[in-house]
Amino acid sequence: LNVCSLWRGGTHGGWGAVSGLPDVDPALGYYDDGLPEVADWEIKFMVENGIDIEHFCWFAPADNQIEPIKRSGLGFALHDGYFNAKYSDLMKFTFMWENSKVNTTNLEDFKKYIWSYWMDYYFLDDRFYTTENKLVFTVWSWQNFKEAFGGTNEGANEAVAFMNEDAKAHGFDGILLFFADGSAADPSSFTAMANLGASGAYAYHWGQAGNNADETIYRLKGNSSYDKLYIVPAVSVGFNDIGWSNIRKPLISTDDHKKVLEFIKNDYLPQQTG
């Protein structure tokens, strides 16, 4: 489950934008990310509904990280909440490198300041998500990933090769790296992601179109049909950002949500290989 943990008083926008809108009141009330009790309630809600992996946004503290990281940006929900939650062992976690600011300009700085932090704080934690003993994580912008390592496919592939090698040096069998697709729906974008060494791509969400089951199914079929790399079957609900846009937008119905899930279970996944 993708989560962007922006909900702590005094950080980011806080609750002010939505506090006058009872139809979007959170089930937990106006909570603070970072409280272990909040994390435990979230874990309870998720595991009771079949969700076993929480996918946090990870923000580097600097636009260009050239010193050791003491604390990642907006990391309260993961570091103070989930890590200290009583029931955190009931589900796994991973992260999306939210690299909209690129965060590094070369592989050596990435190794020294970002990758080493991930290894120490996340990858070696027993709760970190792996499959087939491979570390699984994602990146927000494939274009910025490429820019971070010299702006070339060769530079990006060198970085991915390093990640695989270092993961193996720490007892894993490599990495699985997925790029958010940035709403791409063309084969050239997915070819570009594959050329950077990605294991696959996924939709962070489907935007407002995510409230329509047929549109979601159409996009999944289309992106997968290009056969450039594996497409993770994302399930979205729409994008009701009324607190910021002042426009109320409908979310997906339970029937349409079920329709997408059943399509993925019964049609999409059985056709996947590799």
Residues covered by each model-derived region:
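Glycan-processing catalytic domains of CAZymes
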Residues: 1-274
